[in-house]
C-alpha cells in the first residue's frame, strides 16, 4: 500500500468519525429538547398559559430565601447544565406571574440579568416569576422561578484537631445563600475585626483561612457580607457565625467489638451491632461498614440493611435482617471499622438458635 493510499484512507476514516460524532451530538441535543418539552407538558395550567409557544421551555426552579436578607435567582435554562452551553450572548427579561396577568419586573429587582430582591420579606414567598432568555440570533427559552422561606441558620460548631491539616490551616466558610452579588466580606473573632494580613489570616472568596493553628484560635467567628443596592444608601449586611473549638492532637486508635455469631430463628427478624470505641472521646472519626459474603457493602436496602449511629466517641453499625430465611444460615458478614489512621475488621456468622 502506497503512502498516498494510506493518507487517503486516514482522511476518509477521520471524516466518517467526525460525521458519526456530529450525528451523535445532534441526537443528544434533540433528546434534551424533548426532555424539556415533556416537562412543559406537565406544568399546571396556571403556569403553562403564560409560556410563549415560539420559545423553548427551560425548566423551573424552587429557590430558598431567608427573611430580611437578599435573594437572587438565575433564569433556570442559564443555570441548567443541560442547556447553559446553548446560550452565550443573550438578554434576560423577568416578569411576575399573577392570577390573570403578568407584570414586568422593575430594573431595581434585576442585577446582572438575575432576579434580585434586596430585602426578602414574607410577601415574596411563593411568588412566581417568568424569565425569557433571548439570544442575538432571536432564539428564546423560558423558565419559571419560585421562592420559599428558609429559616436562618444558627451558629455552626466546628472542631479542629491540631496536627491534622496544620500545613493548610483551618478554613471557615461563610455560609451565605446568595454570594454571587456581594461586595465584600469582613470577618470578626469574638467581636473584634480580623486583620487579613496573609500571614495569620488570609481570605479566599467566602473562606477565611487561619494559618499556623493553635489552641488560642478557638472562639466565635462572624462573617459580615456587604451587598450594594441602588435604593439604599448604606450597604445591606448579612451575617453568619461559626463556633470554632481547637483541640490538642488526639489518639485515633479504637477498639472494634462484634459477637462472632448471630443467633437467628427462621421466619423472624434479627440484628447484630458492631461497635467501635475510640480511645479519645472528643472525636467521632471512625466509620463502620458492613460487607456481605460476596464482599459488597451493605447499605439501606431491603431484606438486609445497615444503620450507622455515632455519639461521644462510640460508633455503632447495626446489621438488620427483616426476615431470616434458610439461605442466610452459615453466611459470614464482615464489619470493617476505619478512620484516616487505622483499619480493623471482624466477622460474624449466621447460626440457628
From Swiss-Prot:
Glycosylation: residue positions: 119, 184, 263, 271, 323
Keyword Endoplasmic reticulum included in the entry's annotation: no
Pfam families reported in the protein's UniProt record: ig (PF00047), Ig_2 (PF13895)
BP term (GO), one: symbiont-mediated suppression of host innate immune response
Gene Ontology cellular component annotations, sorted alphabetically: extracellular region
Quaternary data: Interacts with host IFNA1.
Protein name according to UniProt: Soluble interferon alpha/beta receptor OPG204
Species of provenance: Vaccinia virus (strain Copenhagen)
Lineage per the UniProt record: Viruses, Varidnaviria, Bamfordvirae, Nucleocytoviricota, Pokkesviricetes
